């Protein structure tokens, strides 16, 4: 499917940016020192996404394949785990470490730690603000120039809160990408090809006694501009990324993102909307759909809107797959099976 490379490149860029903010300089040192401790604190599993049974490695009939949409969603989930889980685990570890130490100063009710000069020698300094109100741990992460002396000299990179109420863990955080651009030394060589703007708001809730979990990622004027050696690509979104699992193990996934999907020559430089949806049963059987849509007459898809539908068994192998008629001449052998084998109808999809 032509969208795979383009979608992954945009999400990987986001992941790298999110990770470098929490795993750089002195903050990496602090997170390593802070590992372990309070079992009631937020943990990686609280925000980790997964398909029903993951992608199994069992040997099978060579004719068995996983669908394009299934593979894209699986890779998107893995990319998202990298920076969402990394952000939460990193911030939780930093909170544990600093919460047991005397603050550098105070700012109202906030305890302020730093600014600390970056351990890697870059022109960066890091500052953390913590507060605890009735069991809700609030945090802010700031970054500024290496000679920063106070809160006034740094910019907010991330803020959020974490809480635990018996078996229910919840929280959220905001990641401000404009701050990354204001301090480009946070970027590594690969990131230097990307320009970020806007913010992402992540919220999550998990019942540790069941399989119920929900994770929402709201894009707010979020944009990634990739400036490559051969061409440029832009990806942006004001939509929401949703992941749900219920008590019985059933679940759903939804993501919408605008971008340029021209890797296979089925689209030109215009921007279209990609929509990915999936739903699955407690047994892990399910249905997925991938669409690339022209919006308000904008787009240059070769044959208009693209629509791929799939059904799969619990290990992700497809039982049915179809592409809309407008594109079947491009891939005449694409359609497989009959829709009657699907355990879920299209109405089960969240989009």
Placement of each model-derived feature along the sequence:
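Bacterial N-terminal signal peptides that target proteins for export
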Residues: 2-12
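Hydrophobic helical h-region of N-terminal Sec-dependent signal peptides
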Residues: 12-16, 20
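C-terminal motif of bacterial Sec signal peptides marking the signal peptidase cleavage site
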Residues: 22-25
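Extended, charged low-complexity segments
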Residues: 248-250, 254-351
